[in-house]
Amino acid sequence: MEQFSDLIKNRRSMRKFTDQELTQEEVVALLKAALMAPSSKRSNCWQFIVVDDKDMLEKLSHCKEMGAAFLADAAMAVVVMADPLASDVWIEDASIASIMIQLQAEDLGLGSCWIQVRGCPRVNTCIRCLIFRCSCRWFPL
């Protein structure tokens, strides 16, 4: 258990990133960690979109007025979405999945930072772009 204690003590939000791309193995590890997250009644109401397209990361960095600009410099983002009709605790379920991604990132030696955009007016436009854009990578797990 000492390793886990070290992991949670050492994890910090990072807002400065290198342009080094993640390997497919690293991305798969992050997504597997998210899929292992507990959810209410095992509803698994979340969905994950991996974004590594620089233009899309730039657009996403403007999805809220303040606090997301650093996303433009990241090599990749995982967009965590949840269906409010699938679970009455969808916010909590998505939050738990998000922290699982962050803990896995820390374990892999990767920096991460949570950006909360729920309720931001520009989010719907960004999400529509994500869903219909071909530049997102999907990994079968």
Language model regions located:
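Specificity-determining recognition surfaces
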Residues: M1-V27, W138-L141
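Glycine/small-residue-rich phosphate/adenosyl-binding loop
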Residues: E25-K32, M36-A97
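A glycine-rich helix N-cap at a beta->alpha junction
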Residues: A69-D73, A77, I127-L141
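Small-aliphatic-rich amphipathic alpha-helix that forms the alpha element of a beta-alpha
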Residues: A34-L35, V78, A86-I127
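Residues that form generic nucleotide/phosphate-binding pockets
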Residues: L7, C63, C126
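Short, cationic motifs built from Arg/Lys/His that form the positively charged side of catalytic pockets
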Residues: R11-R15, L57, I101
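Residue-level "edge-of-site" marker
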Residues: Q47, R118, P140
